Regions:
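Short coil/turn motif common to extracellular beta-sandwich-like domains
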Residues: 1, 97-102, 170-172
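Tryptophan-paired
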Residues: 5-65, 114-199, 226-232
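Extracellular beta-sheet/turn segments enriched in Thr/Pro/Gly and aliphatic residues
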Residues: 68-99, 104-108, 192-232
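Extracytoplasmic beta-rich ectodomain segments of secreted or membrane-anchored proteins
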Residues: 99-106, 111-123
């Protein structure tokens, strides 16, 4: 991934050096900085583990190679084991790899005038990233709430999205989708069981969300690695 491509996908690049199980160096860069995508670190001789994480969030905790975020966004990472000695190359090229699966719900019918928020509740995946494996660490419940701009009300074919870290490269998740008005009253809710997901893929659920009758088809976007289709 080029610097320009990474800046488009990520706003933050975090670097951690771990030596003997302890974080011995930490650096955060933000897109727009002249040094973005160029990490300089005086690494002493010995064995080290280097972690690189690109995202649009904030790492709230990093321990044993597992990163926790305040929210899950498009995320790329790489873990490098490096033995530093007199013969070690001073420049190490790093290619970050996308770690998330993306879920999209497309409402083909018009958004109701009283819609204020939509909420995804995802089970069967993780909101934390094990950078060594590139996968989630343990199963937990992830909730994402999206504020709906008033300018979108009445529009059709609106897309709502959430990212998650799968526990395996390919796995199934359960998704509860809930739409609410400004007072928190539920307008409509849908549950989708066994939604097939894959890291670096977009699984897309498309259908009439707010009507009395609804039907859904599920696809995955080739803008990433591929597509997954479902019909209900």
């Amino acid at each position: 991934m080029t610097r320009a491509a990474l800046e488009d996908a990520c706003s933050v690049l975090d670097y951690f050096r771990v030596t003997d199980g302890e974080v011995t160096s930490f650096l955060t860069q933000k897109s727009g900085e002249a040094s973005f995508c160029t990490i300089a670190d005086e690494i002493p001789y010995g064995a080290h583990k280097l972690y690189f994480i690109g995202h649009k969030s904030e790492v709230t905790d990093f321990e044993n190679g597992v990163a926790s975020f305040d929210k899950v966004t498009d995320t790329f990472s790489y873990a490098l084991s490096l033995e530093v000695n007199a013969n070690t190359e001073s420049v190490q090229p790093i290619e970050l790899i996308r770690n998330v699966a993306k879920l999209e719900l497309v409402a083909v019918d018009a958004l109701p005038d009283n819609l204020a928020t939509v909420e995804f509740t995802i089970t069967g995946a993780d909101k934390n990233l094990d950078v060594d494996t590139g996968l989630g660490e343990t199963e937990n419940t992830q909730v994402k709430t999206i504020q709906v701009p008033e300018t979108n009300l009445g529009k059709t074919n609106c897309t709502f999205a959430a990212y998650t870290f799968l526990l395996e490269e390919e796995s199934s998740i359960a998704v509860d989708f809930t739409a609410k008005d400004k007072d928190g009253n539920i307008i409509v809710s849908h549950t989708f069981e066994n939604v097939e997901m894959q890291t670096n893929f977009i699984s897309r659920i498309t259908g009439k969300v707010f009507g009395d009758q609804f039907g859904f088809s599920i696809t995955a976007s080739t803008e990433w690695a591929g597509e997954i289709d479902y019909e209900f």
